[in-house]
Amino acid sequence: MPVTDSIADYITRIRNAGRAKNSTTDIPYSKLKENISQLLLEKGYIKNFTVITTEKFPFLRIDLKYMQSGEPAIKELTRVSKPGRRVYDGKDIKKYLGGLGLYVLSSSKGVITDKEARAQGVGGEILFRIY
């Protein structure tokens, strides 16, 4: 059965792997998912990711990050904009949890955080929020 919302699938796979205390998870590849993974790596929410190409299809292998207590580094990961209800925000996007968490946006400048969007003066589609 085909996936209608690939970003929701990406988020769910990461969330489920964290709850199951798995060290890695495999996700079907797309350029958007690679860009999101790069952003999560830069912000310290994941340990690493690699693009693995097989004969059938490429996929992303994401190495999850855990705290010393054993809890996942990602406490909350929630989809905001959905196929049935797209959510856009302008350049004055509000902070998530007073700046403790992040909104991840798809903008004309690529995949960026809410802080970067405010600094660059751009808006975009709010893909998800992470804490």
UniProtKB/Swiss-Prot annotation:
Keywords: Ribonucleoprotein, Ribosomal protein, RNA-binding, rRNA-binding. Pfam families: Ribosomal_S8. GO terms for molecular function: rRNA binding; structural constituent of ribosome. SUPFAM superfamilies: Ribosomal protein S8 (SSF56047). PROSITE patterns: RIBOSOMAL_S8. Transmembrane segments: none annotated. InterPro entries: Ribosomal_uS8, Ribosomal_uS8_CS, Ribosomal_uS8_sf. It comes from the Bacteria. GO terms for cellular component: ribonucleoprotein complex; ribosome. The keyword Glycoprotein does not apply. One of its GO terms (biological process) is translation. Belongs to the universal ribosomal protein uS8 family. One of the primary rRNA binding proteins, it binds directly to 16S rRNA central domain where it helps coordinate assembly of the platform of the 30S subunit. Part of the 30S ribosomal subunit. Contacts proteins S5 and S12. This is Small ribosomal subunit protein uS8. The gene is rpsH.
